[in-house]
């Protein structure tokens, strides 16, 4: 049975002090609980702005601000909302931080590193206003997880009698799980795990059976009478990504890791990778069982097994979401890769930097699962083809990253690659795709027009804020709220706390 952890001192920090974060974020952000409206809300400028009428943006919490002893840490990413709240509710925010330096030059010891390992924030928020009443770290830095990306709250809506927050490491590094995470020593293990957090007990544990890969998200699909999770490999070595499914008897089976991993395989050997699908074409398929030893092993073993067993090869799978009107439909983003080209054998491979291949912008895929057996795929097709827009096209979707669905729309965040930062380009946008009409509209963009910023973690918050309301994060990568020479790691490393913000966005008609 997997070992679970309970962080010490889990009492929530209530609002007593707010930290000024300085001119880099537009001046000090100061507020007090001793006013006519309880709870904290940032006074920093919004890091996201509307692009069309009918869109309203409200900043809620900015990196570096404190609520009691809790500080909102850098690189906020996935957001999961507990739907069981009333006048207040719980939300869980991932932090994509790591104490493994990146970038890093081993020969010189020069590089950048975050102050903390990955963490999962637990915030209590007021319905309607978005004011934050308290905060804590549900999964602390001391757990030595790396780069939490997207997350998902699985509960009654997905048929889970035991609610769990599922979070995910997007990392390949070998790290120590106790003590100092890096550099790796004896007994270190490779990162790339899915992690389950139990809100009822505060315990968390690694779910090794969900596979070791660059997990972006693990999303629970309702309607099958068992726990069904879909996940993908957000590989750093694109094009080398696969779509996986984890099945267990129920939520307890996920918690105890008694489920098994499955991998998607096409029914047509001639349509077996990202480039084989285009236009309105589709292919059926099925998920094949992955041996437990492979699923529990390292990332190289899983990649090797997937190639040997002709698992469908995507380029770089990002976030996933199911259709709110038909739960058997799953949408997922693939960010594309300009260096992805076919080699002499006709297989997708990675060409040198500067290559302008046929897949520069990415896609949104649509997968229709069988209504009774989730391992049977009725069809896989391309819903939105950003690649068709070509290079240096402002109007094209650029590197889709996080996604969310409502009954009406699909919301898509961008994380543009360097090749999409051309003269005249816009910065990272939030798009709305209308299911009824197929129209794509860019509804918001990060506030800095040129810097390395992205929006992330978009999640439907209409239950607590009304129709068309979402929570979303911004990662302001080039804004360093705080830096410090590292006291114990090799000379030349600088600790940094990147800027970012949690916001409420309302989108009319979404």
Go through each PLM region and give its residues.
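Secretory targeting and sorting signals
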Residues: 5-33
């Amino acid at each position: 049975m997997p070992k679970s952890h309970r962080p010490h001192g889990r009492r929530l920090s209530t609002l007593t002090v707010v930290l000024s974060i300085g001119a880099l974020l537009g001046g000090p952000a100061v507020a007090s609980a001793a006013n006519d409206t309880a709870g904290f809300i940032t006074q920093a400028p919004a890091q996201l702005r509307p692009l069309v009428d009918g869109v309203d943006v409200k900043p809620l919490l900015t990196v570096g601000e404190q609520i009691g002893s809790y500080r909102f840490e850098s690189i906020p990413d996935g957001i999961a909302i507990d739907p069981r709240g009333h006048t207040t509710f719980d939300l869980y925010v991932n932090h994509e931080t790591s104490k493994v330096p990146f970038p890093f030059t081993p020969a010189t010891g020069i590089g950048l590193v975050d102050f903390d390992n990955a963490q999962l924030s637990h915030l209590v928020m007021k319905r309607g206003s978005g004011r934050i009443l308290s905060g804590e770290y549900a999964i602390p830095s001391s757990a030595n997880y790396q780069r939490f990306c997207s997350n998902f709250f699985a509960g009654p809506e997905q048929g889970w009698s035991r609610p769990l927050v599922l979070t995910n490491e997007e990392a390949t590094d070998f790290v120590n799980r106790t003590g100092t995470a890096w550099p790796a020593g004896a007994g270190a293990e490779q990162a790339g795990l899915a992690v389950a957090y139990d809100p009822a007990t505060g315990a968390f544990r690694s779910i090794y059976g969900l596979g070791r890969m660059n997990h972006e998200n693990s999303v629970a699909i309702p309607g099958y009478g068992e726990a069904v999770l879909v996940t993908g490999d957000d590989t750093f070595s694109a094009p080398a990504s696969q779509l996986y499914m984890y099945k267990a008897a129920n939520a307890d089976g996920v918690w105890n890791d008694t489920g098994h991993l499955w991998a998607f395989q096409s029914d047509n050997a001639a349509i077996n990778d990202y480039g084989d699908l285009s236009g309105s074409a589709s292919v059926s398929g099925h998920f094949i069982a992955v041996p437990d030893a492979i699923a529990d092993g390292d990332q190289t073993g899983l990649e090797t097994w997937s190639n040997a067993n002709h698992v469908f090869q995507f380029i770089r799978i990002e976030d996933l979401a199911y259709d709110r009107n038909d739960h058997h439909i799953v949408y997922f983003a693939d960010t594309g890769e300009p260096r992805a080209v076919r080699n002499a054998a006709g297989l997708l491979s990675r060409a040198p930097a500067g290559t302008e291949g046929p897949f520069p912008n990415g896609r949104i895929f649509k997968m229709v699962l069988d209504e009774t057996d989730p391992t049977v795929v009725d069809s896989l097709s391309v819903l939105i083809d950003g690649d068709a827009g070509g290079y240096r096209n402002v109007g094209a979707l650029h590197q889709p990253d996080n996604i969310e669905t409502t009954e009406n729309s699909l919301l898509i965040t961008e994380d543009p690659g360097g090749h999409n930062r051309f003269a005249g380009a816009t910065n990272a946008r939030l798009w709305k795709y209308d299911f009824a009409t197929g129209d794509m509209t860019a509804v918001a963009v990060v506030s800095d027009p040129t810097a390395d910023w992205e929006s992330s973690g978009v999640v439907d918050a209409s239950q607590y804020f009304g129709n068309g309301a979402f929570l979303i994060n911004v990662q302001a990568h080039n804004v360093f709220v705080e830096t410090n020479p590292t006291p114990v790691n090799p000379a030349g490393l600088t600790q940094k706390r990147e800027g970012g913000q949690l916001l409420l966005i309302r989108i009319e008609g979404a």
